[in-house]
């Protein structure tokens, strides 16, 4: 009987700080004490561990057992420490060998039968263990996540007995990976599925190339949602680093990560009834929200005025900083949240603001649109109207335009040009970088400033128009921003023009 030390990992946001599980067995009144700031679920592990050890045909020591989860000031939650606690008890009671424990880390929840159940946040733990050159033993069901870090680096097990057999040299564990048969079938959707709306498709191309936030405005049934769903198909796959960040966030929710297409950019479309916690993250134990699950991908908000205003306004800071900070009494938790925002809305409560179907006056339309705050609208680089198709378009077959593959090729070439010039896409350029990479001739700058005053736009909008113009120039292979690029960028300010028109009618 003595002391055993087992290495494990906690889960704090997308971080996996190390936790040392110290188990001491001594003579005295039989008891099981757990210290080190454990949550209720961790305290309950005492009963799970005892039953798992007995049902795995080991002896549970009838002595005084003290388990310390260090560091003590780090909050611990969930059943992820069941496996290391059980192994610590077996090692301290000399029922398994201790010589390999230093090179291993363990996470996993134990069933009463000794089976190891899956836990959240395995991927961040696997990355952290890899940095300190330790092998992480994970539950069988989490093997796919650990495999993203490296198949040869980590191991998975189905039961406590399997782990003990590996530590004692009786068998060698490997890393479980699901069958390739789960590979997702490639998408069959295409831009040519959409009849007409060539200006909307052009805006989609510009937004995809420069990663610009885009707002679709128009009556019901004109193709706003359909256009938004095609945006991800124009974007290149994530880099290894981006994909690992996104997968790490996904692993915190126990959503399945398909290792065969895990580099595809995420597309999240929350319902308009979503709460603030669902959208930006929260909870007693902070969990990522939709904006973090859309990290490095696309967040689509349909029927934007139907969202609560405070929920929409909570997006303002993450859109600028690229992260969300959730504060709790125990500390702050940070989640990455750099996403491309695409919104869609009807221009009035009835869906129409002009023509024979319009049934709302300018005052009620303004009241409806005021659910979107000015600072939030300011964060859209582009806003474009998607009108109803002209009469005869459907009967004549309509203009379906270019295929997704043709547009995607131009988008990828433009993005490569941006990355070669500044190391980032145009939407992420800061103020000083705009001055460096997006210079304007004096006459063009005066033209843009004049347009800015006529529309009543802010300095933030000024910078966003320049960045959109820079993207348009990149798509055309131009090194310098010219007047036509600025004019086209100003054309994508439909929301500003609508609000100015309604305000004038309401006077």
Language-model segments: residues:
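Walker B catalytic acidic pair
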Residues: 296, 302-304, 314
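Conserved alpha-helical scaffold flanking the Walker A/P-loop in AAA+ ATPase domains
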Residues: 205, 260-261, 266, 274-299, ...
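Peripheral, non-AAA+ core regions of ATP-driven protein-machinery
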Residues: 1-215, 219-226, 262, 327, ...
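The Walker A (P-loop) glycine that initiates the GxxxxGKT/S ATP-binding motif of P-loop NTPases
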Residues: 218, 281, 303
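Basic, amphipathic alpha-helical bundle interface domains used for macromolecular binding and assembly
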Residues: 35, 41-46, 61, 68-78, ...
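Conserved inter-motif catalytic segment of the P-loop NTP-binding fold
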Residues: 242-275, 282-283, 429-433, 439, ...
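Walker A/P-loop
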Residues: 215-259, 321
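Catalytic P-loop NTPase motifs of RecA-like helicase/translocase cores
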Residues: 113, 301-308, 351
């Amino acid at each position: 009987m003595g002391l055993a030390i087992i290495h494990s990992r906690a889960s704090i946001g997308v971080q996996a700080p190390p936790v040392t599980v110290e188990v001491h067995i001594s003579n005295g009144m039989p008891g099981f004490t757990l210290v080190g700031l454990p949550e209720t679920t961790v305290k309950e592990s005492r009963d799970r561990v005892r039953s798992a050890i007995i049902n795995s045909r080991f002896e549970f020591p009838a002595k005084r057992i003290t388990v310390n989860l260090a560091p003590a000031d780090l909050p611990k939650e969930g059943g992820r420490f069941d496996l290391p606690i059980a192994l610590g008890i077996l090692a301290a009671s000399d029922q398994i060998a201790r010589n390999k424990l230093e090179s291993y880390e363990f996470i996993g929840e134990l069933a009463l039968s000794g089976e190891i159940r899956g836990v959240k946040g395995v991927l961040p733990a696997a990355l952290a263990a890899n940095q300190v050159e330790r092998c992480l033993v994970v539950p069988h069901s989490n093997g796919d996540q650990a495999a993203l870090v490296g198949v040869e680096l980590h191991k998975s097990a189905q039961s406590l007995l399997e782990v003990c057999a590996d530590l004692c040299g009786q068998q060698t564990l490997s890393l479980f990976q699901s069958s390739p048969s789960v590979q997702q079938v490639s998408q069959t959707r295409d831009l040519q599925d959409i009849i007409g709306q060539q200006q909307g498709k052009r805006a989609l191309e510009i937004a995809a190339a420069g990663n610009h936030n885009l707002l679709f405005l128009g009556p019901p049934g004109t193709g706003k949602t359909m256009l938004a769903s095609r945006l991800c198909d124009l974007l290149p796959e994530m880099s290894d680093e981006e994909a690992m960040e996104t997968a790490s966030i996904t692993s915190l929710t126990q959503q399945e990560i398909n290792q065969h297409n895990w580099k595809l950019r995420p597309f999240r479309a929350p319902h308009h009834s979503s709460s603030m916690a669902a959208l930006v993250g929260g909870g007693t134990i902070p969990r990522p929200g939709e904006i973090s699950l859309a990290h490095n991908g696309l967040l689509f908000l349909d029927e934007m005025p139907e969202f609560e205003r405070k929920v929409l306004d909570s997006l303002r800071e993450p859109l600028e900083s690229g992260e969300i900070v959730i504060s709790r009494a125990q500390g702050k938790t940070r989640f990455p949240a750099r996403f491309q925002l695409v919104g869609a809305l009807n221009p009035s409560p009835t869906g129409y603001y002009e023509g024979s179907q319009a049934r709302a006056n300018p005052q009620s339309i303004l009241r409806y649109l005021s659910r979107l705050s000015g600072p939030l609208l300011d964060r859209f680089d582009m806003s474009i109207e998607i009108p109803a198709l002209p009469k005869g378009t459907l009967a004549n077959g309509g203009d379906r335009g270019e295929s997704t593959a043709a547009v995607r090729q131009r988008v990828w070439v433009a993005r490569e040009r941006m990355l070669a010039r500044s190391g980032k896409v145009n939407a992420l350029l800061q103020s000083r970088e705009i001055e460096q990479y997006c210079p304007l001739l004096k006459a063009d700058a005066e033209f843009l400033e004049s347009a800015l005053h006529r529309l009543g736009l802010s300095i933030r909008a000024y910078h966003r128009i320049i960045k959109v113009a820079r993207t348009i120039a990149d798509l055309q292979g131009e090194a310098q921003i010219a007047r036509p690029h600025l004019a086209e960028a100003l054309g994508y300010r439909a929301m500003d023009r609508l609000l100015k028109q309604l305000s004038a009618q309401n006077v």
